[in-house]
Amino acid sequence: MTRKYFGTDGVRGKVGESPITPDFVMRLGHAAGKVLAHGASTGQGRPTVLIGKDTRISGYMLEAALEAGFTSAGVHVLLTGPLPTPGIAYLTRALRLSAGVVISASHNPYYDNGIKFFSADGDKLPDEVEAKIEAALEEPMTCAPSDDLGRARRINDAPGRYIEFCKSTFPNSQDLRGLKLVVDCAHGAAYHIAPHVFHELGADVIAIGNQPDGRNINDGYGATAPGKLIEAVREHGADLGLAFDGDADRLQVVDSEGRLYNGDELLYLIVRDRMAAGFAVEGAVGTLMTNMAVELALKRIGVEFVRAKVGDRYVLEELNKRHWTLGGEGSGHLLCLDRHSTGDGIVSALQVLAALRRSGKTLAGLLDGVSLFPQKLINVRVEKGFDWQSHAGLKAARAVVEPELAGRGRVLIRASGTEPVVRVMVEAEHAETAERAAQTLAEALRA
């Protein structure tokens, strides 16, 4: 499907520039409302949507615009205020609502924002519904008669409901007593959620990145900037550090030694724990960028590994296609579909903590069978429209390099989607091998 407005993760951009303007977002809400109202005319009753947001200052403006758009189309609106993206997915499903909407740009700076939709089941909106919304955007905006306008109200118990849901994904037989955790909320949507979840399960919690001011989301804190977390873990002598991004769908973990563990390693750990608990795990899904050491480690324990395109949307699609439950990305998007319908940083952290409790081991101990392969990435600038896939010199160089890796490394070459650059990535057991192979391929491209 060719999308005019919807990208792989909703509608996103810089605030004040198309399409993230108040007038467009109001029209987007109205168009989505018309699509939902049409579905309701087939006997489902008047539709109600849930709207949540992260802590960006533009969230107030865009929330008001969405509210106006939906209610003008005859759709009722429930407003949660700041709440993690996966919390909106959960509550949409739990409250039996028609759809959920999140105002967030995830890990991006505060001056970006976006609109993301969830279906009634808490899943991403189907492509055909996105297509209907885009078609409705091309129609004139007509307000419903006064008797048919929607109502809007705030729900005050949304944080508490979501906190209890998160806790329900942690084994009843376990608690977190005796653990000291540093929790970095990125000054984002988890600031008033994550610390409570871990505290109520018994942990001693030191919260950082939990003072949002509308402009500091993801600024020097959170999953994309773990430096402050590493410092705090060492300063407080904590057992672990947990970092979430602005909308709390990503997770990065730091151990007591200050070592950072990414999503690839955490995916392997969760798979191993499910197996240790007696659950069958047929396979797991990563992406084109997942470290090969994780793929090989999973194969050693009899778990099939499949690579999807980069993006949690594509990981989810592959999991659903194969009826598997576990997948993720190195960035920290982890999917545990036996616990939640979408990626959830807090729920993922609880799965990691459950594995530590069940095993009695440290993170390093649980992952001693996985030593990530070194990666070498070289960006080669090319002319716009350059056809690297037909480049004879690159093909010849690849024919030499790949046999040398002998199944203990890999080559990934792809064009950037945003600039005239071809990215050459080589992964190998030894850094020198990766460096040499990447340079060979890059030089062939430049020739």
From Swiss-Prot:
Activated by phosphorylation. Transmembrane segments: none annotated. Gene3D superfamilies: Alpha-D-Glucose-1,6-Bisphosphate, subunit A, domain 3, Alpha-D-phosphohexomutase, C-terminal domain. PROSITE patterns: PGM_PMM. InterPro entries: A-D-PHexomutase_a/b/a-I, A-D-PHexomutase_a/b/a-I/II/III, A-D-PHexomutase_a/b/a-II, A-D-PHexomutase_a/b/a-III, A-D-PHexomutase_C, A-D-PHexomutase_C_sf, A-D-PHexomutase_CS, Alpha-D-phosphohexomutase_SF. Catalyzes the conversion of glucosamine-6-phosphate to glucosamine-1-phosphate. This is Phosphoglucosamine mutase. It comes from Cupriavidus pinatubonensis (strain JMP 134 / LMG 1197) (Cupriavidus necator (strain JMP 134)). The gene is glmM.
